[in-house]
């Protein structure tokens, strides 16, 4: 079943992709004053003038057309991912909309800006210097805020809550052509309650996660209708569970490390059933096997064969004996 999120570079500290590294490329005269001809909103002339001076000294301001062309050519999937309007913050005092600004690192930012401390604050879009990743969302003092969309050029994305630049809280993660997960995250990984559609292995899972793996209780259903409901540990069936196979067979009991192991009950689609000990998906130990209600074997098993002491019950008769690999070698 595998770790749903280990196969993509999307899992990383998002803030490392979008950190302002200091000096920016100097703009040519006139660009800044043309784009900022009047102070927007309620910011004071003094604050605004200071911002213009810094931008003119340190920033390269690119045109809106160039910015949109980069997005349309490098991130064509951006518009297919709905961004919730409730997470677009309303500008407050000293926060205003800045045009596309290119840092010396090559990173590009367009969005809300704090004119007091000259840092990204509010809602904005940032494109990494190599144009491989884009962040659209909330900013706080030049760092990724509490909510946003982290999108890779190949279409992989995370949309949801962040904490200190990491995926944390509720979110949605899609690895194109491989899987889509919706649920809770912690430290960049699924952790808590969550649902995953695995397109590669053709299954859906709903349940508990820990550190990117299925841990706790859950329901796993494959496209062929094989279905498991029960306990998981490290992505494997482990504990008490029920598995229903596509042909109608059913097992209910204990699992260890992904295998049927321990006490359990198996019912075949033709009515036969077994109740007893299992080891590695095979009858091993003590158990009862019913051919029907009138005939059953009670005794010892080895690798799916009657082996050791046992009794065959047929109607009201009993036959005690010693068995060896499914055949009686001594009995009455």
Question: Which ranges hold each PLM region?
Answer:
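Intrinsically disordered, low-complexity repeat tracts enriched in Gly/Pro/Ser/Thr and acidic residues
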Residues: 1-332
């Amino acid at each position: 079943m595998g770790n749903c999120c280990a196969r993509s570079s999307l899992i990383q500290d998002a803030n490392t992709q979008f950190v302002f590294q200091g000096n920016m490329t100097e703009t040519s005269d006139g660009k800044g004053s043309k784009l900022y001809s009047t102070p927007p909103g309620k910011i004071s002339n003094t604050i605004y003038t200071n911002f213009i001076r810094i931008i003119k000294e340190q920033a390269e301001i690119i045109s809106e057309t160039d910015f949109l062309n980069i997005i349309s050519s490098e991130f064509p999937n951006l518009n297919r991912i709905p961004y919730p309007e409730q997470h677009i913050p309303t500008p407050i005092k000293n926060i205003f909309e800045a045009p596309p600004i290119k840092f010396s690192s090559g990173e590009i930012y367009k969005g809300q800006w704090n004119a007091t401390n000259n840092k990204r604050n509010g809602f904005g879009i940032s494109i990494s210097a190599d144009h491989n990743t884009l962040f659209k969302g909330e900013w706080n003092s030049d760092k990724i805020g509490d909510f946003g969309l982290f999108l890779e050029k190949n279409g992989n994305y995370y949309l949801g809550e962040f904490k200190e630049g990491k995926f944390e809280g509720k979110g949605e993660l899609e690895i194109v052509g491989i899987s889509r997960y919706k649920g809770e995250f912690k430290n960049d990984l699924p952790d808590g309650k969550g649902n995953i559609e695995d397109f590669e292995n053709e299954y859906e899972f709903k349940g508990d996660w820990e550190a990117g793996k299925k841990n706790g209780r859950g329901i796993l259903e494959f496209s062929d209708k094989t279905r498991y409901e029960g306990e998981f540990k490290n992505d494997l069936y482990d504990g008490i569970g029920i598995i229903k196979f596509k042909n109608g067979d059913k097992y209910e009991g204990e699992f260890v490390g992904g295998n049927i192991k321990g006490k359990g009950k198996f019912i075949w689609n033709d009515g036969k059933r077994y109740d007893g000990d299992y080891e590695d998906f095979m009858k091993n130990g003590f158990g009862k096997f019913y051919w029907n209600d009138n005939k059953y074997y009670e005794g010892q098993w080895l690798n799916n064969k009657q082996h050791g002491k046992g009794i065959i019950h047929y109607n009201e008769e009993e036959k005690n004996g010693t068995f060896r690999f499914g055949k009686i070698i001594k009995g009455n």
